[in-house]
């Protein structure tokens, strides 16, 4: 076995339980990883210098193939209604087969860190079969200083071997694809998929498991900071505008996807961004677009022409095209990945039913209710005749990555909001003037104006009314915004149709929240929406 590259001399590949007749490359830099990826025909270089890779069959995560080892340490800690268990015996068989499979491979190792707060940082060793995967994770996690690598000791190991095929009978899994996590030993095994996002989300899941016990709230959110040190957190599911709205040039970007909130403030879990590129344009999102033309960026499943020029409008391979780049590629990004206590928490939803106001102020109990609900709505795709929006509830705005019961995260959030007197806002970037198909999308200028008023504090002194369905406080007037749009019912031509739609959405909220009734306190249950018919 040949080992090359910079590493801790007492922490070779054997500490991960691996040995190989091939070469082990430790902590290669971008140019070295480009050379290896091109030499192995894993990827090509775009016309502008980015590394372009395809993931084959799997162009997204495989949540049905993700398992957590069920043992004495996790039995009462994991939310098993939402996480698939794997026996210790099955994991051991899988681990042995992973080791055997790796014996003939060249391996790429990156020693990295999850978490910009030194007190809560998780040193992670990521072992990959592909050089481009090594570059991807090097972009996404936090890189130690080169001098620190000589003393690096991992507390978590991720082994990603796409050419490995799991055996459902032998390994207790569902298909040949597997993402298996042993949270006691902090080992993650990824096989049968080339989708790079599995590595990033495995580290996120581990931090979501570890940090609550330390009083730190892990969050699937973006975050930014104003010039006065005012920090804002943006929760939101895919398609709600989380990345776009937090990428405000006048504010410092702390991170776009994963953060922790603890006694000293908030901190990014990552050192990079994994942005969607479908329909990406230089005009609409110039900073993200610029990263796609830089050496070091990974373009995942992006279609390029014979000259290596990307076509971001081409979704023929997948709509889930991505670019992965280090955070310092964004000019207004934070250098530390850390900031103080938040002043505002924004919960984004894209309500395609046209019922919710464009902005509402939440009490701590209402904030916990809507955080646990994690509501947005998907709109119809290209199927003929499909016109109805579909409600989506993803608790904590990130159910697939939350190993503990949602109430653990919800209680942490409520306590932190109360302790630091944080203002909480629900912002609807969805439909107004009717539901999807009748109304129209909330103008981005309106959303930005309302968000600006919330973040600069001017909305605090506004006059509010109580929403008759959801019970939260809605501003009556905001400078620069048409007052009509603030009251969704008034934007509908058919007021009775609005009332029917509102009742329908409220009933969905109530039905979804039933599973949390025994896990939350009375004030949170009382924050549940009620049908109170509005007057004409």
Swiss-Prot record:
EC number: 4.1.1.49
Catalytic activity from the UniProt record: oxaloacetate + ATP = phosphoenolpyruvate + ADP + CO2
UniProt entry keywords in alphabetical sequence: ATP-binding, Cytoplasm, Decarboxylase, Gluconeogenesis, Lyase, Manganese, Metal-binding, Nucleotide-binding
Names of required cofactors: Mn(2+)
GO cellular component: cytosol
Cofactor: record remark: Binds 1 Mn(2+) ion per subunit.
Pathway the protein acts in: Carbohydrate biosynthesis; gluconeogenesis
Binding site for ATP: 201, 220, 236-244, 285, 322, 447
Annotated compartments: Cytoplasm
Alphabetized InterPro entries for the sequence: PEP_carboxykinase_ATP, PEP_carboxykinase_C, PEP_carboxykinase_N, PEPCK_ATP_CS
Function recorded in the entry: Involved in the gluconeogenesis. Catalyzes the conversion of oxaloacetate (OAA) to phosphoenolpyruvate (PEP) through direct phosphoryl transfer between the nucleoside triphosphate and OAA.
Sequence similarity: Belongs to the phosphoenolpyruvate carboxykinase (ATP) family.
Identification of the protein by name: Phosphoenolpyruvate carboxykinase (ATP)
Annotated source species: Chelativorans sp. (strain BNC1)
């Amino acid at each position: 076995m040949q080992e090359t590259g910079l590493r801790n001399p007492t922490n070779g590949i054997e500490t991960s339980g691996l040995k190989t007749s091939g070469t082990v490359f430790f902590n290669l830099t971008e140019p070295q990883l480009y050379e290896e990826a091109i030499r192995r025909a894993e990827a090509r270089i775009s016309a502008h210098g980015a590394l372009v890779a395809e993931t084959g069959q799997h162009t997204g995560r495989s949540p049905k193939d993700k398992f957590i080892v069920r043992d004495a340490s996790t039995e009462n800690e994991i939310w098993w209604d939402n996480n698939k268990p794997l026996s210790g015996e099955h994991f051991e068989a899988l681990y042995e087969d992973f080791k055997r499979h790796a014996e003939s491979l060249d391996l790429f190792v990156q020693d990295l860190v999850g978490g910009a707060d030194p007190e809560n940082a998780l040193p992670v060793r990521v072992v990959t079969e592909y050089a481009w995967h090594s570059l991807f994770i090097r972009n996404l996690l936090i890189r130690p200083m080169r001098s620190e690598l000589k003393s690096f000791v991992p507390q978590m190991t991720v082994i990603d071997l796409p050419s490995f095929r799991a055996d459902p009978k032998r390994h207790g899994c569902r298909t040949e694809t597997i993402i298996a996590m042993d949270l006691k030993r902090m080992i993650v095994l990824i096989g049968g998929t080339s989708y790079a996002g599995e590595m990033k989300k495995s580290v996120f899941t581990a931090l979501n498991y570890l940090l609550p016990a330390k009083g730190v709230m892990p969050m699937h959110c973006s975050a930014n900071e104003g010039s006065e040190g005012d920090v804002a957190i943006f929760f939101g599911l895919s398609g709600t505008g989380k990345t776009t709205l937090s990428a405000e040039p006048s504010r410092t970007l702390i991170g776009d996807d994963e953060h922790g909130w603890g006694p000293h403030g908030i901190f990014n879990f990552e050192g990079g961004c994994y942005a969607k590129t479908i329909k990406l344009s230089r005009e609409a999102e110039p900073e993200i677009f610029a990263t796609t033309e830089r050496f070091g960026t990974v373009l995942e499943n992006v279609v390029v022409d014979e000259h290596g020029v990307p076509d971001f409008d081409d979704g023929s391979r997948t709509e889930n095209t991505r670019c992965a780049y280090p955070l310092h590629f964004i000019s207004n990004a934070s250098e530390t990945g850390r900031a103080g206590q938040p002043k505002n928490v924004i919960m984004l939803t894209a309500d395609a039913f046209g019922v919710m106001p464009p902005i509402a102020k939440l009490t701590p109990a209402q904030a916990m209710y809507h955080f646990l609900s994690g509501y947005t709505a998907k709109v119809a795709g290209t199927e003929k005749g499909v016109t109805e929006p579909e409600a989506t509830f993803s608790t904590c705005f990130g159910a697939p990555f939350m190993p503990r019961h949602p109430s653990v995260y919800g209680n942490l959030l409520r306590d932190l909001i109360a302790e630091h007197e944080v203002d909480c806002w629900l912002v609807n970037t969805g439909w107004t003037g009717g539901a999807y198909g009748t109304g129209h999308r909330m103008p981005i200028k309106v959303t930005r104006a309302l968000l600006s008023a919330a973040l600069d504090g001017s909305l605090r002194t506004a006059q509010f009314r109580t929403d008759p369905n959801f019970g939260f406080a809605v501003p009556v007037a905001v400078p620069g915004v048409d007052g009509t749009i603030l009251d969704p019912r008034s934007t509908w031509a058919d007021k009775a149709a609005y009332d029917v739609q509102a009742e329908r959405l409220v009933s969905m909220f109530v039905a979804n929240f039933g599973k949390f009734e025994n896990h939350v306190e009375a004030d949170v249950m009382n924050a549940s929406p009620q049908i109170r018919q509005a007057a004409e």
